[in-house]
């Protein structure tokens, strides 16, 4: 009997985002709001934007083809393909089935996996499915691909500045340089903070204050669950340790970097401060918290989610740690905005692109995945091999710098076009192909039966 696969994780990664973006600073002027509302209040600099030439299928085709081609992956070596998205354009047909066109020329149609959906969490559900498949008795020796991607757009109003777009594809298999640790902590519950009940529109229903509280409240619960599980694994299963001591035994200091689902930068910073608060709450008498008011330990934990004094105290307490543990993963969100299911993994691409391979060896990364409604998980990655090829293939910094900043009016007009043509039949998109990257897929036509066909920009185009 062959040995079970070891060191299962990410072997290669690719990211795709639109070629164009708008400036959040210019958007403040365009919307007539106070200066700093978007750039300081949300912590955002730019937001990726696209028009009717791109949809979730074209995003997925672009990112998976890029993963295969840049890393010389044989399509026949893939045995599973999972997709996570909340950008739904068909209530029955999955994005995964469209992606099978990339594998048909090789004759490989024996690929398991399908789409997962729950707001921004679907990519993580897809990832866990792929990891579990590789580690299971069903594994056939081939690698898996996980795709996470979305087009995040909002109706005119206060939420529009926290949109964005992008997708990430990950090659999952054994003997990987980025290894997933076995402990997961998950919290799921029923909330109505963000949802999309109107299938005739791409826009969600959003309760802004509620979604912030849900994000942070689920972080508390997922972090608790993660620490309990990680402590048990660390000690060799349950051995009489209390939950309280288990919670205190796992802390942010155990990790070199932290990554969060990233709707916008300011919420990520709140999330990091919340982790530090949870460490304090589990071990308030530790001398390292001497600068924190002692009475914070006696406050009801749930009530502190909206307590500005607590938030400010831990923002100040964690200011230095934030620069080293959090900041390296922020490039993508600041340039592309919210990528929904892909945002956490866009942060991972940023982190890898900012830290040299030799410096990141042996380091641990704590990840927080969240999707409204709500689903949340905490898990960890350990770096166990060279990341040089991953960084070289992705070429993130050059690609982010090459994005074209367009006027805000262009973005508004693109959204109006999408509104007018959403669910349209006998529709040929009007977006200009020169606005797309070389090698990108695009929507070519929607026929009288809603069937979509796609084209591709030549890879050698300017």
Swiss-Prot record:
GO biological process: acetyl-CoA metabolic process; ergosterol biosynthetic process; farnesyl diphosphate biosynthetic process, mevalonate pathway
SUPFAM superfamilies associated with the record: Thiolase-like
Catalytic activity: acetoacetyl-CoA + acetyl-CoA + H2O = (3S)-3-hydroxy-3-methylglutaryl-CoA + CoA + H(+)
Involved pathway(s): Siderophore biosynthesis
Residues annotated as catalytic: 86, 120, 261
Record-linked PROSITE patterns: HMG_COA_SYNTHASE (PS01226)
Molecular function as annotated in GO: hydroxymethylglutaryl-CoA synthase activity
Entry EC no(s): 2.3.3.10
PANTHER family to which the protein is assigned, alphabetical: 3-HYDROXY-3-METHYLGLUTARYL COENZYME A SYNTHASE, HYDROXYMETHYLGLUTARYL-COA SYNTHASE
Record-stated family: Belongs to the thiolase-like superfamily. HMG-CoA synthase family.
Stated role: Hydroxymethylglutaryl-CoA synthase involved in the biosynthesis of siderophore ferrichrome A which is contributing to organismal virulence. The first step of ferrichrome A biosynthesis is performed by the HMG-CoA synthase hcs1 which catalyzes the generation of HMG-CoA and CoA using acetoacetyl-CoA and acetyl-CoA as substrates. The enoyl-CoA isomerase/hydratase fer4 then catalyzes the conversion of hcs1-produced HMG-CoA to methylglutaconyl-CoA.
Protein name: Hydroxymethylglutaryl-CoA synthase
Source organism: Mycosarcoma maydis (Corn smut fungus)
Gene: hcs1
């Amino acid at each position: 009997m062959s040995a079970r696969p070891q060191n299962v994780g990410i072997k290669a990664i690719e990211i795709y985002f639109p070629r164009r973006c708008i400036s959040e600073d210019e958007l403040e002027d365009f919307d007539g709001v106070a200066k700093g509302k978007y750039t300081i209040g949300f912590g955002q600099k730019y937001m990726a934007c696209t028009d009717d030439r791109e949809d979730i299928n074209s995003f997925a085709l672009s990112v998976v083809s890029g993963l295969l081609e840049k890393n010389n992956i044989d399509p026949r070596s893939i045995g599973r393909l999972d997709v996570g998205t909340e950008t739904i354009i068909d209530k029955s047909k999955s994005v995964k089935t469209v992606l099978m066109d990339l594998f048909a020329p090789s004759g490989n149609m024996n690929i398991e996996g399908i789409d997962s959906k729950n707001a921004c969490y679907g990519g993580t559900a897809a990832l866990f499915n792929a990891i579990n498949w590789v580690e299971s008795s069903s594994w056939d020796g081939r690698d898996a691909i996980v795709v996470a991607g979305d087009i995040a757009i909002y109706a005119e109003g206060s939420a529009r500045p926290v949109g964005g777009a992008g997708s990430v594809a990950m090659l999952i298999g054994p003997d990987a340089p980025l290894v997933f640790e076995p402990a997961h902590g998950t919290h799921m519950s029923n909330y109505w903070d963000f949802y999309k009940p109107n299938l005739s529109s791409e826009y969600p229903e959003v309760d802004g204050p509620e979604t912030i509280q849900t994000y942070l409240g689920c972080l508390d619960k997922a972090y608790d669950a993660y620490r309990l599980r990680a402590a048990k694994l660390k000690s060799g299963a349950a051995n009489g340790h209390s939950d309280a001591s288990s919670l205190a035994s796992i802390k942010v200091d155990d990790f070199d970097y932290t990554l969060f689902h990233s709707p916008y930068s300011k919420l990520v910073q709140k999330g990091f401060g919340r982790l530090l608060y949870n460490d304090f709450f589990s071990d308030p008498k530790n001398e390292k918290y001497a600068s924190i008011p002692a009475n914070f330990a006696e406050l009801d934990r749930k009530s502190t989610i909206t307590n500005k004094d607590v938030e400010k105290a831990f923002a100040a307490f964690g200011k230095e740690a934030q620069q080293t543990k959090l900041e390296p993963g922020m490039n993508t969100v600041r340039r592309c905005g919210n990528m929904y299911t892909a945002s956490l993994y866009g942060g991972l691409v940023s982190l890898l692109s900012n830290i040299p391979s030799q410096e990141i060896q042996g380091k641990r990364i704590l990840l927080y995945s969240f999707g409204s409604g709500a689903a949340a998980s905490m898990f960890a990655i350990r770096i166990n091999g060279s990341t040089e090829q991953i960084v070289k293939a992705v070429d993130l910094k050059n690609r982010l710098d090459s994005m074209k900043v367009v006027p805000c009016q262009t973005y508004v007009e693109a959204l109006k076009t999408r509104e007018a043509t959403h669910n349209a039949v006998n529709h040929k998109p009007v977006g200009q192909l020169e606005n797309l990257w070389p090698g990108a897929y695009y929507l070519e036509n929607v026929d009288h039966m809603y069937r979509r066909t796609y084209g591709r920009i030549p890879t050698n185009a300017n």
